Amino acid sequence: VGFKAGVKEYKLTYYTPEYETKDTDILAAFRVTPQPGVPPEEAGAAVAAESSTGTWTTVWTDGLTSLDRYKGRCYNIEPVPGETDQYICYVAYPLDLFEEGSVTNMFTSIVGNVFGFKALRALRLEDLRIPPAYIKTFQGPPHGIQVERDKLNKYGRPLLGCTIKPKLGLSAKNYGRACYECLRGGLDFTKDDENVNSQPFMRWRDRFLFCAEAIYKSQAETGEIKGHYLNATAGTCEEMIKRAVFARELGVPIVMHDYLTGGFTANTSLAHYCRDNGLLLHIHRAMHAVIDRQKNHGMHFRVLAKALRLSGGDHIHAGTVVGKLEGERDITLGFVDLLRDDFVEKDRSRGIYFTQDWVSLPGVIPVASGGIHVWHMPALTEIFGDDSVLQFGGGTLGHPWGNAPGAVANRVAVEACVQARNEGRDLAAEGNAIIREASKWSPELAAACEVWKELKFEFQAVDTLD
């Protein structure tokens, strides 16, 4: 009765340019590169179909449900400027397609099988609009920016961090010693590298103990609250939570997770534990470039950043704009706003395809890390502002006099930049002069300035705005 077997074009069902999006729809912007001979309407409709209710042929069970209620719809297609065969296809998904509070389920639908679809040469998810109705089903960050500042009693400046190097091979005691030197020199945080988990040369429990000792000793000496991102990432969720429990028992303020390699289910579980037990959660994005670096295939980091804000994390690495790792300024500032702000307007010049309302979900502090040193401090302070963590690994530990003087140099530099900014000086124009002035009364900063005066990482960004 009305069931007609066979294959029909996707666009007959899933391309609906007259559709008016609802406030409750999840909206997606895909960069679609169709195979030669496939019209953009068919390609866009195929994406909508394969990431929602469709399959390659008509099935009789379609008659048992309301397709109009549940299908994804490609409602707009724009050619990409300067490209002959690329299109931005906008797809609207009804909210009922997704399990509440599950980033895992959201991604399984939207970026699941469709990425292997033969009719497409390449496919990239550029942005998502998450509706308030769906956001409200997530806890989000365990604490958020304001609560973190209150817990740490640190206001009015960027926070300073340092990744302990060499990233692998140190014993737990030597590792703790390196943390202590950095913290007593003036840093707020030290950090486990993302691949430090629990290896034969340094088991996790030993590391946690010696790092806790470093935290308490440096706090006693400086009168400031200190932290070390203890990486709780593990082979199973149960083991990860066990490590977080031990961190809580030690009384340290913050733990860490590699959210892409660990997975969103594990990350959300850890974020819930952290909120329930007063731990801050630092998130590392190891593996992100596998997904987000190619311009025409994969998923843009702004989508991974939004997903993290839903899943939960208090800090996330967000590129530097000035260091050794990929990140164009306008694009980076676009997703930094999406991490921190309550409401972000659509702004294609910064890669933001949709207006996003976060309806009181706490913000995430962006972490700038990777190939940065004291000469970058004015630019970083200007670009990222106060609600950020500036992380100098080699830029602290590479100081010719050792870790503590390296930490002193960074602390003096950031305090000088904040003071200059507060006095109304232009950090972009006067940055080098500000650092030079400060180095006159800080021999540690002067030595750091000398070591890194010529160093630059200058390559063209791969992922640029159209």
From Swiss-Prot:
Annotated substrate binding sites: 113, 163, 167, 285, 317, 369
Keywords: Calvin cycle, Carbon dioxide fixation, Chloroplast, Disulfide bond, Lyase, Magnesium, Metal-binding, Methylation, Monooxygenase, Oxidoreductase, Photorespiration, Photosynthesis, Plastid
Cofactor: binding comment: Binds 1 Mg(2+) ion per subunit.
Single GO MF descriptor: ribulose-bisphosphate carboxylase activity
SUPFAM superfamilies for this protein: RuBisCo, C-terminal domain, RuBisCO, large subunit, small (N-terminal) domain
Modified residues annotated as N6-carboxylysine in this record: 191
Residues given in the record as Mg(2+) binding sites: 191, 193-194
GO BP annotation list: photorespiration; reductive pentose-phosphate cycle
Gene Ontology CC: chloroplast
Protein name as catalogued: Ribulose bisphosphate carboxylase large chain
Originating species: Aphelandra sinclairiana
Gene label: rbcL
